């Protein structure tokens, strides 16, 4: 390799492209740090309040739902980002198709979860907890907007939404502890965080002068996405 080729292959740290990706990565790291910090502080507070038994029940319900939640996401995350990067003009078609696929997947996940709880003869209280928590899969459908900002290397919008919803839900958890709330309310707040996420993504999408009403479902696109993503679903469950 010539000296000129070597120079050309070096990273241009002063380029706009590098600055854009560096800033994007910094936003992602910042969100992870904030999430870990808040989860640690509030988590200890909540665990001490609930105690081993109640916290165990809540964790079990969340994990139980998690087994079926992968069906709702359909393993489409990286696939959709790839397609949006490849052809940004298909934005409404891709986001619309994935949105409706995730709605269908969420309904299937909810049905399978509830049926399984009865087959396993779970207690009434466990079924109630699981039934509340599994509704979060429906609200995760609008999170497809996250893929759009990932593809545009604008993760700051995702960080705004995710951090805001986390902070609000954490404050509510602290208030629940303060007012001696029952375990059911903590399950409701778990779902509320996803509701806040959906609302937040809707807002940032609208702020960027984009409309969800423009989304459209295209069967050929949906089939193509599922064909590419299905190998990722099983590993996600396991």
Label every model-predicted segment.
Residues 11-20, 50-54, 68-103, 150-157:
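Transmembrane-helix boundary and interhelical linker motifs in polytopic inner-membrane proteins
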Residues 130-134, 160-207, 224-228:
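Hydrophobic alpha-helical transmembrane segments
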Residues 19, 23, 27, 96, ...:
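Alpha-helical transmembrane segments of integral membrane proteins
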Residues 43-44, 77-82, 143-146, 150, ...:
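Interfacial helix-capping/hinge residues at the ends of transmembrane alpha-helices
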